[in-house]
Amino acid sequence: MRYITAGESHGPQLTTIIEGVPAGLPLVADDINEELARRQKGYGRGRRMQIETDQVQIVSGVRHGETLGSPIALVVENRDFAHWTKIMGAEPLTEQEEKEMKRKVTKPRPGHADLNGAIKYGHRDMRNVLERSSARETTVRVAAGAVAKKVLAELGIAVAGHVIEIGGVQAKETTYRSIEELKSITEASPVRCLDEEAGNQMIKAIDDAKSNGDSIGGIVEVIVEGMPIGVGSYVHYDRKLDAKLAAAIMSINAFKGVEIGIGFEAAHRPGSEVHDEILWDEEHGYTRRTNNAGGLEGGMTTGMPIVVRGVMKPIPTLYKPLQSVDIDTKEPFTASIERSDSCAVPAASVVAEAVVAWELATALIEQFGLDRMDLIRENIEKHNEYARGF
């Protein structure tokens, strides 16, 4: 599977075209809208979320509630475009209109794509950069991820994300009895945190940052249960599943770090405390005593839950902006201010779920793939039976 996205933050709409989804997958707009609504929630979001109520339109590739095997086109309207029609319109402006145009950006924000992107593409108005580099684009990445989640769910694979740290406040209680319990608890939390006490402290940290005109980041974790053993590859570097997952997490706006399993903690432990001992029983086949590897060894799945974490830096747009330079005058100025969130970590956990789900669904279709969901399901069932008795 593959997809591309198009659209600007304040343009008329966001679009994604998805190729390679098997035929026979049950899919309706509500499957996608549910994920879009989850992305819009979360403590610390800005005023934009009060304007937009993201709803997807399925333009192609689905008929009567089932995928056809042809490309799927999804569109999400930007309601805020009504206030930006002249500024973000596709038609050329007159010389006078260009002089009168508001919201031209010439003061780049430290930590954002503004300056680097303007230099790369030769834009004197950095709005041309920030409109596309905005995290608004993750709306349609979540839409594509919702399709991938649907593929996984049909194959008995569950995906859930949660927040384990915001602004230096760490969740101490992160245990759960089932992935359904994890989902239930996090969906009820304003910051998508399993630890209620830590969640309350995270809310206070977000409030403090907002009142100071600042922003804060954090860490999200995605857990996936039900993946078969041996998905991915050790044969080539670019087919290793952990490498693909790491790239997917790092592709999310403002993410600066990733780890799988115990991750960087492995540097502090001897091998005897890191590697997961192998067990076998007749009912389950091969399992592990622990899951320090996070469900991945040698670029392939082990059959244990996949555990991936990502670090999100504080959002670069600050209401008490940092020092910058006006690219027209070269004079020092404080950076431009755009409407923004004080913390988007809870929402980012939903985006992280989406990109992880996409990579896993793609890997499954590549390995067991045919053009029909029923045949893929049969192939995976045969593989699981083979692996249990290996």
UniProtKB/Swiss-Prot annotation:
Top-tier EC class: lyase
EC numbers for this chain: 4.2.3.5
Listed pathway(s): Metabolic intermediate biosynthesis; chorismate biosynthesis; chorismate from D-erythrose 4-phosphate and phosphoenolpyruvate: step 7/7
Binding site for FMN: 132-134, 253-254, 298, 313-317, 339
GO CC annotation: cytosol
Binding residues for NADP(+): 39, 45
Cofactor stoichiometry and binding remark: Reduced FMN (FMNH(2)).
Cofactor dependency: FMNH2
Domain of life, per lineage: Bacteria
An example Gene Ontology biological process: chorismate biosynthetic process
Gene Ontology molecular functions: chorismate synthase activity; FMN binding
Cited InterPro entries: Chorismate_synth, Chorismate_synth_AroC_sf, Chorismate_synthase_CS
Catalysed conversion reaction: 5-O-(1-carboxyvinyl)-3-phosphoshikimate = chorismate + phosphate
Region entry Disordered, spans: 95-117
Keyword terms: Amino-acid biosynthesis, Aromatic amino acid biosynthesis, FAD, Flavoprotein, FMN, Lyase, NADP
NCBIfam families cross-referenced by the UniProt entry: aroC, PRK05382.1
Complex and partners: Homotetramer.
Function: This reaction introduces a second double bond into the aromatic ring system.
Protein family: Belongs to the chorismate synthase family.
Protein name stated in the entry: Chorismate synthase 1
Native species: Bacillus cereus (strain ZK / E33L)
